[in-house]
Amino acid sequence: MRFKILQKDGLARTGIIETQRGIIHTPAFMPVGTNGTVKAMTPEEVRQIGYEIILSNTYHLYLRPGHETIKMIGGIHKFINWHCPILTDSGGFQIYSLASLRKITLEGVEFRSHIDGSLHFINPEKAIDIQLALGSDIMMVLDECIPYPADEEYVEKSIKLTTEWAKRCKEHFEKQDTYQALFGIIQGGVFSDLRIRALEELLKIDFHGYAIGGLSVGEPKTDMYKIVKDISPLMPEDKPHYLMGVGDLIDVLHAVEHGIDMFDCVIPTRNARNGTLFTSQGRISIKRSEFKEDLSPLDPDCDCYTCKNYSRAFLRHLYTCREILSMRLNTIHNLYFYCRFFEKMRQAIAERRFQEFKKEWLPVLEKNFYQESNDFHHSLENY
């Protein structure tokens, strides 16, 4: 994997990540394909919209159909018919979400499946082996996702554990003959000094890219923004910077401003299934009665399949009837909106007008905004 910066505007930057399966233009958004599929979409549709990379969840694929099954079939790309890059997480966040069903030690983590209660054990070496079997293009180290709130003493112990796991992941990774890349994960809760210390330790290990993990888990937005502002500029300039699990576009703008290159989140797809849609005029809830006889397109400025073919009235009808087509049409639109937003943002950085872009979009993104719980994605079934 190679990373090249094409243009900078302040700390915001646009670039390309070169992988064996294709180029990823950054800043990049990765739709979440929990079980190997972006919900309600075919891989071909996701690609046609313009996405160059998706994220798949190691935890879910490990439990079913199983990483060995996917390896036998020929790897995750063949299995799901997606021939562009894939990033797999290590499963750390999903295991963290199990709370009472897990036990963490220096050796690894023991947990019970949320599906059938069966007992499992994953250590750093196994986390790498699972991702090797899946055949993703970018792998993540096993880490402990720190809950919020957490006191400083707990966080300090946790980052020592994550650092030790990162060393073991890298040592095991280096024994393999693979084209895959491995990213380290910076933990540390809301304590900037501990985050900086964690980053310094990861830099000694040396990874292909670096991720900020453990945010968007219930902490105030101001804390999230402060961590990104304090940490991102200290990450190696010549390697990708990834903010894990963050996808609210307001948060994205603040993060890109400080040098973040990669994002993933279930927001566009989950919101689509719940009837919340992003438009050039702000968010709308399609279930509202005001759209019952509205024959205008969802977003007059959008060229997606949904907006070119269907009215707000029809989309509301589908949603209130709980038709499966509602999920599909809404998801097509939200993913299209996100993809075009990132394209426009990259263009703004390339033309050195990112601040104008941010100033233009913040009021739009805040319009009709309803506060969504930061911990909505803690439920494994929400993926």
Swiss-Prot record:
Enzymatic reactions? 7-aminomethyl-7-carbaguanine + guanosine(34) in tRNA = 7-aminomethyl-7-carbaguanosine(34) in tRNA + guanine
As given in the record, the signal peptide range reads none
Q: List, from the UniProt record, the residues annotated as the active site of this protein.
A: D89 (proton acceptor), D264 (nucleophile)
On cofactor binding, the record's note says: Binds 1 zinc ion per subunit.
The pathway that the record names for this protein is: tRNA modification; tRNA-queuosine biosynthesis
Gene Ontology CC: cytoplasm; cytosol
Locate the residues binding substrate: D89, S90, G91, G92, F93, D143, Q187, G214
Q: Which InterPro entries match?
A: ArchSynthase1/Queuine_TRR, TGT, TGT-like_sf, tRNA_ribo_trans-like
Q: RNA binding: where is this region?
A: 245-251, 269-273
Keywords linked to the UniProt accession: Glycosyltransferase, Metal-binding, Queuosine biosynthesis, Transferase, tRNA processing, Zinc
Q: What is its EC number?
A: 2.4.2.29
**One Gene Ontology biological process:** tRNA wobble guanine modification
- List the GO molecular function terms: metal ion binding; tRNA-guanosine(34) queuine transglycosylase activity
Q: Which cofactor does it need?
A: Zn(2+)
Q: Say which enzyme class the record assigns.
A: transferase
Which residues does Zn(2+) bind? C302, C304, C307, H333
NCBIfam families, alphabetized: Q_tRNA_tgt, tgt_general
The record's subunit annotation is: Homodimer. Within each dimer, one monomer is responsible for RNA recognition and catalysis, while the other monomer binds to the replacement base PreQ1.
UniProt xrefs under HAMAP family: Q_tRNA_Tgt (MF_00168)
Q: Which family does it belong to?
A: Belongs to the queuine tRNA-ribosyltransferase family.
The free-text function statement in the UniProt record for this protein reads: Catalyzes the base-exchange of a guanine (G) residue with the queuine precursor 7-aminomethyl-7-deazaguanine (PreQ1) at position 34 (anticodon wobble position) in tRNAs with GU(N) anticodons (tRNA-Asp, -Asn, -His and -Tyr). Catalysis occurs through a double-displacement mechanism. The nucleophile active site attacks the C1' of nucleotide 34 to detach the guanine base from the RNA, forming a covalent enzyme-RNA intermediate. The proton acceptor active site deprotonates the incoming PreQ1, allowing a nucleophilic attack on the C1' of the ribose to form the product.
Quote the protein name from its UniProt record: Queuine tRNA-ribosyltransferase
Native organism: Thermodesulfovibrio yellowstonii (strain ATCC 51303 / DSM 11347 / YP87)
